[in-house]
Amino acid sequence: MLSRAVCGTGRQLAPALGYLGSRQKHSLPDLPYDYGALEPHINAQIMQLHHSKHHAAYVNNLNVTEEKYQEALAKGDVTAQIALQPALKFNGGGHINHSIFWTNLSPNGGGEPKGELLEAIKRDFGSFEKYKEKLTAASVGVQGSGWGWLGFNKERGQLQIAACLNQDPLQGTTGLIPLLGIDVWEHAYYLQYKNVRPDYLKAIWNVINWENVTERYMACKK
């Protein structure tokens, strides 16, 4: 929905208008586990606030912004369309990123991936441990707020690590297909780990849902 509305060229303007006219509002996805299911690695208070407040705010603000964008399209107001781009990117990215993040985690997670994903990690990073070190370093090294990502470069057929600032969506800003995202905004860890981001990164590996990451990897290879 977001990409068609925002990124369409002039030749796609008429279809986009029709699409927006019948669009459905975004909604907050349910978590596939209880708020306390990831303890002791991520506590219930963090998960509840993160999901029901922070993610919900991105969803609500995205819906409001899309309504304003729809009005601007209908009026042919290009200035207003341009002015709304930052809000679309921020709130749309926040919704996309968190929707991936929740499924990337599991109370039954941790350990190592298996099969083709593990082989691809070894091929592109040397070993699973080297991969963990590189993604951890990229995530810890984000200045301010942002995300660390494992993505897939479809053109090269390779896994790549990237860091995105704020809520910039990985695919929309780098072209990489997102497989695993690590939220390093302070709201993701501060209530439990204070300002020690490396401790949060160390803990989150215990709840990574490798089945979900593998499913994403296999899907983007098709």
UniProtKB/Swiss-Prot annotation:
Reaction(s) this enzyme catalyzes, per UniProt: 2 superoxide + 2 H(+) = H2O2 + O2
Predominant localisation class: mitochondrion
InterPro entries linked: Fe/Mn_Superoxide_Dismutase, Mn/Fe_SOD, Mn/Fe_SOD_BS, Mn/Fe_SOD_C, Mn/Fe_SOD_N, Mn/Fe_SOD_N_sf, SOD_C_sf
Transit peptide: 1-24
Signal peptide stretch: none
Database matches in SUPFAM superfamilies: Fe,Mn superoxide dismutase (SOD), C-terminal domain, Fe,Mn superoxide dismutase (SOD), N-terminal domain
Name of this chain's protein: Superoxide dismutase [Mn], mitochondrial
Organism: Macaca nemestrina
